[in-house]
Amino acid sequence: MFPTLCVAYRAETNPYRLRFAACLVALTCCSALIANAATLCVNPRGTSGCKTTITAAVNEASPGDTVLIAPGIYKEDVIIKQSISLIGSNRATVIDASGLANGIFIDGMASAPKAGVSNVVVSGITVRNANFEGILAASASDVSLTGNLVIGNDKALDFSAGTCGDLDISFETNEQDDCGEGLHLMGVDHSTILRNEVAHNAGGILVSDETGPNGHNVISENFVHDNVYDCGITLASHGPAAVTGAHLSFGVGYNTISRNVSMGNGTKGAGAGVGIFAPGPGSTDTGNVVIDNEIIDNGSTGVAMHNHAAPPMAPPVNLNDNVIVGNHFSGNGPDNPGAPTSGPTGINIFSMAPITGTAISRNTFDKEAIDVGFSAPTGQLNVHFNDFSSGVAIDNMGAGTVDATENWWNCPQGPGGSHACATVTGSGVMTAPWLSSPFAPSSSR
C-alpha cells in the first residue's frame, strides 16, 4: 500500500517532500485501522461476553478484527466476506459441518473474476464432515490458511456415479467427481497454505481458476495423505464459471509447492501425489515450481502433468515452463488410462500439445518402474542432476526429445551399462555425459 501511494507523487514539483507526506498519510490511516481493530471471542457457553457461534462473531466483526475461538465443537458453515482473522485453539476448535456445504467459505464471489475479499487468516481449526470442501476460498487474495486439520469432508460424493449431490455447478465447473476436495483455492492469488494436515477427504488440496486467475500462491509444509479418490495436491485449469462471463480459462500459474508430504492419495481413484493439469483448449498451467517434497505411495504417478487438447484445436494450451526439482519419489502407481504408463511412475508428462521450458532436476527415485515418462508431439524436456533408480529412468513415448545428460543412472557405467544401471526406452533421448556418482548423498534422501 505504501509504495503505491508514494509512486503516485513522483511527477510532482517537489517529489521527495510530497512522497514523504503521502507515506505519512498512509501510515496514519493504517495506524488508525490497527487501533480500531477489535478482538471478539467465541466459546460454546457464551461466557465472558463471548458469542456461542463462530458465525455470530464473524457477522459482528469489522475489517481487521480477530475472532478467537475456544475449544469445542461448532456445528456450522462459516462464511467470511471481509478481512478478518479466525484463530482456533490448536485444532481443538472443531467446525463440524455435517449436512452443510462447507466448513469455512471465504467468499469474494461478488467481484469475480477479481478478488472480492483479501487479508483473511484461518489458523488452528479442525474442519470436518462438510458435504463439499472443508475450506473453500473463492475470488480472494492474500489468504493465510495455517495449522488447520481438514479431515473427512466431501461427504456428498458418490464416487461410483461420479456425482456430488447438489454442488453449485454455476461456479464449480469441474468438481462433480471429487466435490472440490478437502481444501480448495478457486481464483485465489498471493496466498499461503502452510503446515496444515489434509486427510481422508475425496482429494487433498485443489488450486483452480473457475472464478478468476489463480497464481503466486505458496503451498508449503503440509501433510496431505489418504485422500483416496483424487490427487494429493492439484493445480488445475478448468473452464470459467458462468458468473464471470468469460469464455476461456483464466489460468493457473507461478505457484510454489514446497516441502510437503503427499502420501497415500488416490489409491481408489488413481490420483497422483501432485497433479498439474491444463486439460482442454485454452487452458493454462504454467510457471509452477514443485520443490523439495516427499511424494510417496500414491495411487497414480508421483507428479502427473496432463494436457488432452491436440493441435490444431484453438485456442492453444499452455503447459510450459513448470519446474520439478529436489523431490523424493517412491512407490507411486502407474498413470491413469488417459495418459498411461506401463508401471509405477515417478513423473509423467503427457501432452497432445508441444511442451517447452519444463525442467526436472535434483530429484531422487526409488521403488518406481519408470522414473520419468514423457509423451508430446514436439518440444524438449530437460532432465539433469537426478538420481535414478534401477528401472527405466526415461521412457519417451512421443516425438518430443529429452535432454537427460548429467544424471546418475544408478551405476558409474551409465544407462544400460550393467544389470544395476537404469535404462532408456523410446528414441530421442540424449544421455551423455552422465554422472559417475550420485548427485545427492544417500544421507540426504
Language model features with spans:
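Functionally critical loop-and-helix segments that line ligand-binding/catalytic clefts
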Residues: 337, 342, 385, 395-445
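Parallel beta-helix/beta-solenoid
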Residues: 62, 81-83, 90, 117, ...
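Right-handed parallel beta-helix/beta-solenoid
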Residues: 32-56, 60, 71, 92, ...
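Bacterial N-terminal signal peptides
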Residues: 21-32
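Extracellular beta-strand/beta-solenoid scaffold signature
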Residues: 97-112, 129-137, 159-187, 199-214, ...
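Extracellular beta-strand-rich solenoid/capping regions of secreted or surface-exposed proteins
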Residues: 55, 59-63, 74-87, 94-143, ...
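N-terminal secretory signal peptides that target proteins for export/translocation
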Residues: 1-17
